[in-house]
Amino acid sequence: MAKRKVTWTKAAITQFDKIIDYIRQDSDQNADKIKDKILNKINHLSDDRIVHRKDPYKKNNDGNYLYFEILKYRIVYYKSANEVFIIRIKHTSMEPKRY
């Protein structure tokens, strides 16, 4: 079975960079650990066997908008037939917004 390509939206890249930069203000080591763990989990989304929950904050979600949480961060992604799009990354303490 072919693996899906993982693509980040510009918004998700910006959010992720801000998160890592914020953590780096206190600890380079913690920033690197968190960055590596999140990236590792995201890279595994290309595997078809990975199943996460449907994103309840997506309006009219046909089931292709999914999410998972890791290290108090909520990652939302869209899963198409050939590709996974990373949509957003937010800390779980932030109020989720419908989109």
What is each residue range found by the language model?
Residues 1-62:
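Basic, Lys/Arg-enriched alpha-helical interface segments
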Residues 61-64, 72:
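Short acidic/glycine-enriched loop/turn segments that link adjacent beta-strands
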Residues 70-99:
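Enriched for short, Lys/Arg-rich terminal
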